[in-house]
């Protein structure tokens, strides 16, 4: 395989380039809070996130929904069948956390692409490894009973995965509503609004056009320790 195909290129871009010879990729858009797939849906396509953020959550019998990952641009998801080698139904609830644009392809054609271009497997493994790490961090975040600690932990995860350097700190490059944050950490909009207000008063964060800037992540991490 030509190394220029995979070197320093997002996985979605690689599959888009391969599209003419291997698969007809489909580009879809979803508004915020729209479901991409439900638990139990047939696992028929693999998704590559082009723009925005996608929330993966696990839904339990009691109706409780726990966020396990927040995917950023260039992430791949819906790949459980590829990993196990067996056809299976969807395990997670995938929802557009922001307006998103996705590239999707039939799972059979992705399997064929991986067979013909083995280097793609390494790219996919790297992406999955990053997601496993984030899932562990999300579980630790939701283990906090105190909502202030949950919010701070969540903001630090966002800094790591969506943060860009800014003159006054790290700007989380997502437009986040208070409701969206509340849904991600298992809280309420009213509580999140109050807690964000406290952090602003303490000069820990600032918010401009729904984008949060964390002025000092280290200082923020010490707020609820």
Swiss-Prot record:
Q: Which SUPFAM superfamilies match?
A: cAMP-binding domain-like (SSF51206), Winged helix' DNA-binding domain (SSF46785)
**Coiled-coil stretches noted in the UniProt entry, renumbered to this chain:** none
Q: Which SMART domains match?
A: cNMP, HTH_CRP
Q: Which InterPro entries match?
A: cNMP-bd_dom, cNMP-bd_dom_sf, Env_Response_Regulators, HTH_CRP, RmlC-like_jellyroll, Tscrpt_reg_HTH_Crp-type_CS, Tscrpt_reg_NtcA, WH-like_DNA-bd_sf
Taxonomically, the superkingdom here is Bacteria
Q: Name one GO molecular function term.
A: DNA-binding transcription factor activity
The record places the DNA-binding region at 177-196
Q: PROSITE patterns annotated for this entry?
A: CNMP_BINDING_3, HTH_CRP_1, HTH_CRP_2
Chain positions recorded as a nucleoside 3',5'-cyclic phosphate binding sites: 9-131
> Which keywords has UniProt assigned to this entry?
Activator, DNA-binding, Transcription, Transcription regulation
Query: Residue ranges of the HTH crp-type domain?
Result: 145-218
The task this protein performs is described as: Required for full expression of proteins subject to ammonium repression. Transcriptional activator of genes subject to nitrogen control.
Name assigned to this protein: Global nitrogen regulator
Originating species: Synechocystis sp. (strain ATCC 27184 / PCC 6803 / Kazusa)
Query: Source gene?
Result: ntcA
